[in-house]
């Protein structure tokens, strides 16, 4: 994404209060003081600048740095690898998939091998992203993302649904406009099997857990229906909350497995509405196209990143040995 797209994506996060545009890559005390920041927080993966040094060393030396654990199973590098390889081994297996585990084992090994050879190249993998496990969601994690907010009796409840794969700025813009239609935004997220039936066996690239938490992180979303049906049903409209409006964007709607319009019921009830968004132009397809067309650049960037991380760790180890 370009810088403008990244600024707006971060603004869409419900935990963000202010975005500092054109921030320096190496965090300084001056920039922290300018924006009234007491501490700087970063994950436990090492961030290396062009000079090979820790980009947070200044704030660490000043005692104003806080480290948090990197979320297990979440890796930009791995996600890019998924896009390049269109692998589906990250998705949750269905009963049918499980019965074919033995036959699939060798192909899974080959796919993982291809991730290393085709994306990371011959260099060693990053110590922070190598062997990334599947992202596992706990009830505690969901509660951390949830608003725990119920609609008020007079609130106008809006329902939208989708796969929200590769959650991006286009999704954020759509959700922002949907929220403007009422007071409470309820979002249905389809499960992996449903998406595969509609879009094909290589979809989605993100698992249901990843997609649900991505949507819950949006500041415009109040609640999520996990594993929502592809076609909007009476249960969706009445049993969770009383839905006043069902909305969808201007993109084409794929028919359900019975070749029916998934929005047939809300259209018949007169509560369906199309949302026009001032789109950034970002879609699932444009992201894939960007990644694939810049494949060589991503591979080279990854090799350099790995080399820097390994060099920094080696230097730190040598320093400790001397002490």
In which residue ranges do the predicted regions lie?
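Nucleotidyltransferase catalytic core that binds NTPs
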Residues: 1-323
């Amino acid at each position: 994404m370009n810088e403008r797209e990244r600024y707006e994506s971060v603004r869409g996060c419900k935990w963000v209060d202010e975005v500092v545009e054109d921030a320096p890559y190496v965090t300084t005390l001056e920039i922290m003081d300018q924006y009234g920041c007491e501490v700087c927080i970063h994950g436990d993966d090492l961030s290396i600048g062009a000079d090979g040094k820790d980009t947070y060393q200044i704030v660490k030396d000043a005692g104003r740095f806080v480290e948090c654990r990197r979320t297990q199973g979440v890796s930009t590098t791995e996600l890019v690898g998924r896009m390049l390889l269109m692998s589906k081994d990250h998705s949750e297996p269905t009963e049918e998939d499980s019965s074919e585990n033995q036959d699939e084992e060798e192909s899974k090994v080959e796919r993982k091998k291809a991730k290393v050879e085709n994306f990371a190249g011959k260099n060693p993998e990053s110590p922070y992203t190598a062997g990334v496990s599947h992202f596992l969601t706990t009830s505690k994690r969901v509660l951390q993302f949830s608003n725990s907010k119920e609609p008020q009796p007079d609130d106008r409840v809006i329902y939208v649904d989708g796969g929200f794969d590769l959650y991006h700025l286009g999704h954020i813009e759509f959700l922002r406009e949907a929220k403007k239609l009422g007071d409470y935004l309820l979002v249905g997220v389809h499960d992996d099997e449903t998406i595969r039936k509609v879009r094909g066996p290589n979809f989605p690239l993100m698992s249901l857990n990843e997609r649900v938490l991505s949507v819950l992180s949006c500041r415009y979303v109040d609640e999520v229906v996990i594993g929502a049906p592809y076609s909007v049903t009476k249960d969706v409209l009445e049993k969770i909350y009383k839905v006043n409006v069902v909305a969808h964007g201007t993109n084409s709607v794929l028919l359900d497995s019975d070749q029916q319009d998934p929005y047939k019921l809300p259209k018949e009830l007169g509560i369906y509405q199309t949302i026009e968004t001032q789109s950034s132009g970002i879609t699932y397809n444009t992201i894939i196209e960007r990644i694939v067309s810049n494949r060589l650049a991503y591979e080279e960037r990854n090799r350099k990143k790995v080399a820097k991380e390994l060099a920094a760790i080696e230097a730190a180890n040598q320093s400790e040995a001397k002490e």
